[in-house]
Amino acid sequence: MECFKTTLAGVVLVVLLLQQAPVLRANDPDPLQDFCVADLDSEVTLNGYPCKPTPAAGDEFLFSSRLATGGDVNANPNGSNVTQLDVAGWPGVNTLGVSMNRIDFAPGGTNPPHVHPRATEVGIVLRGELLVGIIGSLDTGNRYYSRVVRGGETFVIPRGLMHFQFNVGKTEATMVVSFNSQNPGIVFVPLTLFGSNPPIPTPVLVKALRVDAGVVELLKSKFTGGY
């Protein structure tokens, strides 16, 4: 009987720990000081960047004009340009668990289907009309959610869900998005499947996508060298 009680107590403890694990790993670690300006040149990194001495960093780490202007929307076949403002471009957000992007779109331009593995995304359309699409997980039957979002309107993308934006208007469009991670990461679905290095074996994609090898090779040729 005593052995049973000990085993039961152990099982309860494990269950409680498992319940806490998702909470403990839900976002970036909390900061332990007011500022931790990232030392991007340090050779020592451990799930982030070490801190520069605050006096040596000046006060520019609190401010950035990086998103004031966008990039060339015709610089790639997607017809969009992403201006990133993560810890690499704004060392002041180190340990703060936030980052931002600005995305500009040509008419008909798209931010291709992609995933942010480490962050929830919330965005606001500044100008234009963007079709925002979100695809749920298998738990939802891969349900597709979408809406045309216009200037001043907002949207949210749960962490890890595939999504895209597409400019359905006749003029350029711009949106700004924020993440609850200093480095949200991005996995572009088409590039991941057909432009990986080294390539995913063609027979794997033939079986997974239910197409012939010629189609797979054609798609791979479109993503050689990235976007």
Swiss-Prot record:
Residues with glycosylation annotation: N78, N81
Entry keyword annotation includes Secreted: yes
SUPFAM superfamilies reported in the protein's UniProt record: RmlC-like cupins
GO cellular component: apoplast
Binding site for Mn(2+): H114, H116, E121, H163
UniProt-annotated location(s): Secreted, Extracellular space, Apoplast
Record-annotated Cupin type-1 domain positions: 65-217
Pfam families per UniProt: Cupin_1
Summary of subunit composition and partner proteins: Oligomer (believed to be a pentamer but probably hexamer).
Protein name: Germin-like protein 3-3
Species assigned in the record: Oryza sativa subsp. japonica (Rice)
